[in-house]
From Swiss-Prot:
Transmembrane segments: 4-24, 43-63, 87-107, 109-129, 144-164, 185-205, 221-241, 246-266
Function summary: Catalyzes the dephosphorylation of undecaprenyl diphosphate (UPP). Confers resistance to bacitracin.
Any single Gene Ontology cellular-component annotation: plasma membrane
Subcellular location: Cell inner membrane
UniProt topology in membrane: Multi-pass membrane protein
Name used for this protein in its record: Undecaprenyl-diphosphatase
Note: Bacitracin is thought to be involved in the inhibition of peptidoglycan synthesis by sequestering undecaprenyl diphosphate, thereby reducing the pool of lipid carrier available.
Catalytic activity: di-trans,octa-cis-undecaprenyl diphosphate + H2O = di-trans,octa-cis-undecaprenyl phosphate + phosphate + H(+)
Record's keyword annotation contains Transmembrane: yes
Assigned EC number: 3.6.1.27
Taxonomic path: Bacteria, Pseudomonadati, Pseudomonadota, Alphaproteobacteria, Sphingomonadales
Taxonomic source organism: Zymomonas mobilis subsp. mobilis (strain ATCC 31821 / ZM4 / CP4)
MF terms (GO), sorted A to Z: undecaprenyl-diphosphatase activity
One Pfam family in the UniProt entry: BacA
Amino acid sequence: MHDSLLTIILLGILEGVTEFIPVSSTGHLILAERLLGAHGANSASFDIIIQLGAILAVIVFYWERFLNIAKGLFQHSTSSWHFVRNILCGFIPTVIVGAIAYHAVKALLEKPMVVAIALFVGGIAMLIIDRESSHPENTSVQSIPAHKAVLVGLAQCLAMIPGVSRSGATIMGALCLGIDRKTATEYSFFLAIPVMLAATVKELWEQRHNLHIADFGEISLGFVISFVTALIVIKLFLEIVTRRGFAPFAWYRIIIGLVAFAFLLFN
């Protein structure tokens, strides 16, 4: 696993901060582990499990809303059923495309230089899309038509490329389809739950031989740090998006992408 307590803390914070904002948590972990010299099979297992901490943060943050939706399903609420429909419509395309292409894409593109380029290009795209999106047609997750939910799910598949960002792909896809900023952001949060749970279960099964009881303490620490950090970041992210849009995150991607590209090119 990781030799340094500081490395565990830094990676837990990094996962919690970057999982739900459109800057690519996977890309940041790849770059950070390259910089810290913390990579390998055991490192992959650690990365997978700390993602669960970030997922749990979304469930806790929106617990009351999820509870109301669950009650609405039993009361035959159209709004609740539309919410579930849209989560499934966004989730299923990702599962299908992921099952077909995930390993091939991962083998070809999981490289630090690809991450640097994807961060930069994604930042430029984010600036343009955020600037051009106006007059949204859909202002709640329940109001999103099924065909738009499917298209957002297909956009989410771009996140198989390290550095693209799952949240970035879904949010930008949603903005292009006339979904407002806050709704696009929350829809991305909600889609993360089934998508990341499915990906985590799959990866845990494939990495099961690299998991050891001796690593439980390190994994637990990373999990807790990721959870607490993500819980704080979700609220802050929604406030920033509502007030300032996605430009701050786009510029961050552009700068980090350029810095990473230069670092990798000369090292």
